[in-house]
């Protein structure tokens, strides 16, 4: 008999964020941001132990933001077309990149994503990467 699929959906930019400021229109420095590395082996094991077979990571694709990552070769977006400082995780700017906010080391963001996939598989779960093809940034 096939195993029943039970999906745990999570928004990594909220998961593990210890900053409780929650300032409206705040910067990443003011409000903080969860990181891919917050999903440790222990955290993933506890999610698996609750009976989940898959983790649906939502909002990991690079999207419009007012945070300046130009030193990493990421173009800046005009503030008037970005939803808040953090931007919407559905305002995609590059379907082939990971949101730099989610990385401890921005230049290693893809490696951090690959390591999270490996940790998730090691914990006995499969990965679903949120992908909404008709949602893009305004520029």
Regions found by a protein language model. Give the residues of each.
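N-terminal structural segment of carbohydrate-active enzymes
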Residues: 1-126, 134-138
